[in-house]
Amino acid sequence: MAGHSQFKNIMHRKGKQDAMRSKVFGKLAREITVAAKLGTPDPAMNPRLRAAVLAARAENMPKDNIERAIKKAAGGDSENYDEIRYEGYGPGGVAVIVEALTDNRNRAASDIRSYFTKSGGNLGETGSVSFMFDRVGVIEYDADKASADDMLEAAIEAGADDVASSEEGHEIYTSQASLSEAAKALEAKFGEPRKAALIWKPQNNIAVSDEVGEKLFKLLDQLNEHDDVQNVYANFEVSDTLAAKMAG
């Protein structure tokens, strides 16, 4: 099994189903508002807000929408969202982490638990699977921004820990603490990245059958479609055949 990493699969799958633009923009706006409320409304001085704005631009969210979401925080938005991390196991014993921003903890927990249960998995306690992931920073550039060698050299100089280059682009991994500085250094050389954010990176991926893979994608679809869910991570990989089918 050649194995496509689950991270790429989820990103491609999410992009496919996120044709529902209003839902996507709503999630992005929520993260922008929360990030601006927790820190300064200036993306240059607020790494989390910077990451949220980059994500919004990657989805072609209108500039007015982005600015409105930032101003909503500055205007004392009365809505308060709790940041919650859910952890559990999906089909095939695959570990899944779900990050959510919700104004109703009970509703979110009930819905997410239901998705896990119906998929044949189960929702666990916080910490039940996160030990199988590393909390790291990732900076992404399109492949045409630099050669693999040039990107590797620049990333090392910027203090990055690892680089993965392919025809799909460059992924530069950093520690949590060095993400912001590394991103600034690379931006000075290659321009604005398409992404710069903290993620949960699996330490190892589990190769699953196509049957289990389809069940996992169904679970991930349900999770990503939930209004409160911001990010989903899992530690599996599927065959090239299923990856092509899911992306098609």
Curated annotation (Swiss-Prot):
InterPro entries in alphabetical order: Integrase-like_N, TACO1_YebC-like_2nd/3rd_dom, TACO1_YebC_N, Transcrip_reg_TACO1-like, Transcrip_reg_TACO1-like_dom3, YebC-like
Family, per the entry? Belongs to the TACO1 family.
The entry lists its GO molecular-function terms as: DNA binding
Q: Which keywords belong to this entry? A: Cytoplasm, DNA-binding, Transcription, Transcription regulation
UniProt GO cellular component terms: cytosol
Major localization class: cytoplasm
- Short name of one Pfam family for this protein? Transcrip_reg
Q: What is this protein called?
A: Probable transcriptional regulatory protein OCAR_7305/OCA5_c08120
Any single GO BP term: regulation of DNA-templated transcription
Originating species: Afipia carboxidovorans (strain ATCC 49405 / DSM 1227 / KCTC 32145 / OM5)
> Where is this protein localized, as stated in its record?
Cytoplasm
